[in-house]
Amino acid sequence: MTTTHTRNLWWRHLISFLIAPVTMTLVIPALIVIAAGIRAPDLHSPITIGLVTVGALLIAVGIGLLVWTVALFDRVGHGTLGVGNTLGEPVQLVVRGPYRQVRNPMISGVLGILLGEAAVTASGWLLLWFAVFVAVQLIAIRFWEEPHLHRRYGAEYAEYRRNVPRWIPRISAWR
């Protein structure tokens, strides 16, 4: 990858990241918290402390997975998490790191963050947002993303799809 390519890609990374992960994991949950009047958890209860701890761990793992997969899109795929030429989706299929175990580790990271937020706040509203997000992803990935990836990467994606599960990670890495 050339220096010019890297310079031209930084703003695409920023826009892609702001459009998808930041909106889904920060903006929408913040609006829900404000609209529902959700307050900070009362840390006097062992159950609440447990929920906050588990939630914080889910958020940390989710952020780590999200950052790792975005970095792989850049370094291996030479693109961003954006779709189409404008935002620079990867020109090469990414089949490294967590992509060897599961086809959607980036979404898994976002799911970890959303579920963690629901746990930390003990909010049914944020749990509902998590469920809505899952439902939308189930439909979008199956009926839009996978056909798009098949058209873009052809036989390489077909082989990847046959060998790596969509949601439940493989125990051993593929390849």
Regions found by a protein language model. Give the residues of each.
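Membrane-anchoring alpha-helices and their flanking helix-loop junctions
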Residues: 1-96, 108-175
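Solvent-exposed interhelical
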Residues: 99
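Extended, alpha-helix-rich binding/interface surfaces that flank or overlap catalytic cores
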Residues: 104
